[in-house]
Amino acid sequence: MDRDAAHAALRRRLAETHLRAEIYKDQTLQLHREGVSTQDPRFVGAFMAAKAAHLELEARLKSRARLEMMRQRATCVKIRVEEQAARRDFLTAHRRYLDPALGERLDAVDDRLADQEEQLEEAATNASLWGDGDLAEGWMSPADSDLLVMWQLTSAPKVHANGPSRIGSHPTYTPTPTGPPGAPAAPLSRTPPSPAPPTGPATDPASASGFARDYPDGE
C-alpha cells in the first residue's frame, strides 16, 4: 500500500511540474510576441521561471524513466526466477525420470512387453486352429454337422420285437385287395386281360410227354 502511494505521489509531482513548465513557457513566449525586450525584468523573470520548470521536468522525467527501466528489469528478473522455481519444482516432482539407469529399464520393459505380445498372438493363433476354424462356409463346422447327425440317430424311436415294422410280424389290419386301411385305391389297369390258356391235347403236359399213350389206364 505504501509503495502504491509513493508511486502515486511521484506521478502527481511529475504532472504538476509538467503543467508549471508549460505555463511559464507560454508566458515567456507571450512576452516575446508582444515585443518585450529580453532585458526587461518581466521577460527575464518569466524566462528563468520557465527554464527552472523545464529543468525540473527533465530531471523528473529522467528519474521516472530510470525507475521504469529498473522496474522492467526487476520484472524480467522476477520472471526468470519464477521460471527457474517452476522448472525446479517440475524436475523434483519427476526426479525418477532423471535416473541414469532409466533408459536401460525402459528398454528392458519394452522387450518384455514385446515378448508378451508375441505370446498373446501365438495363443490366439492356437486357439483359432483348435476352435471352430474358418467360418466362411457357415457357423457349423463339419464336426458340428457330425454331432447333429449323431443326436438325430440316438433320438430316433427304437423298433420293438412285435412292432408293425418288423419283418415277419403280424399285420395289424385285415389284408384287402386295396391295401391297408386308409391307403388310396389302386388305379384301374388299362392292360387288356390275358387270354385263358387252351385246354386241348396240345397243351396237356401228359399228352405232350407221351405218358397217357404209354399208360392208357393211368397206371
UniProtKB/Swiss-Prot annotation:
It is found in: Virion tegument; Host cytoplasm; Host nucleus. InterPro entries: Herpes_UL14. Keywords: Host cytoplasm, Host nucleus, Phosphoprotein, Virion, Virion tegument. One of its GO terms (cellular component) is viral tegument. Transmembrane segments: none annotated. Residues 161-219 are annotated as: Disordered. Its main location: virion. Phosphorylated. Pfam families: Herpes_UL14. Belongs to the alphaherpesvirinae HHV-1 UL14 protein family. This is Tegument protein UL14. The lineage of its organism: Viruses, Duplodnaviria, Heunggongvirae, Peploviricota, Herviviricetes.
